[in-house]
């Protein structure tokens, strides 16, 4: 019976982790480009009392054996990179990705990070940057006298300048894809970094080699479904209550033993 206390405790810990993941999803329901997570669990080691297939007598063998589980543990938080909705902003510097791929940005230490958040801005040097101030790569400089900015589905960035009828190309927005998006590491600020599990980054022109297309004047919203998360929350609450009941029931059984 002491084992059942610890087994139920692992269930409580697992459901608390599940609840933390759901709460984080709901907290980021309005975060541009956010991808929801899902907690993944696995059962713990088993106490084998009778090996399956062992002989029970000279003539017979056990068909199933006797194994007692020791609980559950969280093994991963899987990020689901499904497409979010495109929300129109009519801001010429906002760009949404429809399909696969990430924008590449430069971190302060010179390394690269990746994001789905295309709510870009222009800094004091005319550089195209994220809302957090990270420079888009390859670098794109918007002239100070630019009257308008046009970003094509293929990532070509052009500006219209005073005194010039034809637009002038000032840069190219590329997309980076990975063999395993789920293997990317989240570092906050809507950014991911490459890991061994994600595979090497592959930079492509939007619309080529499996990369998505760009939509100017839109941002990609979070792919969190509030109704689905609330249903998951109810399931977690019930599972937590059941494990709590297992703890209290075991405690009552132990009390009965001590009264004998």
Swiss-Prot record:
One of its GO terms (cellular component) is bacterial-type flagellum. It is found in: Bacterial flagellum basal body. Pfam families: Flg_bb_rod, Flg_bbr_C, LlgE_F_G_D1. This is Flagellar basal-body rod protein FlgG. The keyword Lipid metabolism does not apply. Keywords: Bacterial flagellum. SUPFAM superfamilies: Flagellar hook protein flgE. The basal body constitutes a major portion of the flagellar organelle and consists of four rings (L,P,S, and M) mounted on a central rod. The rod consists of about 26 subunits of FlgG in the distal portion, and FlgB, FlgC and FlgF are thought to build up the proximal portion of the rod with about 6 subunits each. It comes from Salmonella typhimurium (strain LT2 / SGSC1412 / ATCC 700720). It comes from the Bacteria. GO terms for biological process: bacterial-type flagellum-dependent swarming motility. Belongs to the flagella basal body rod proteins family.
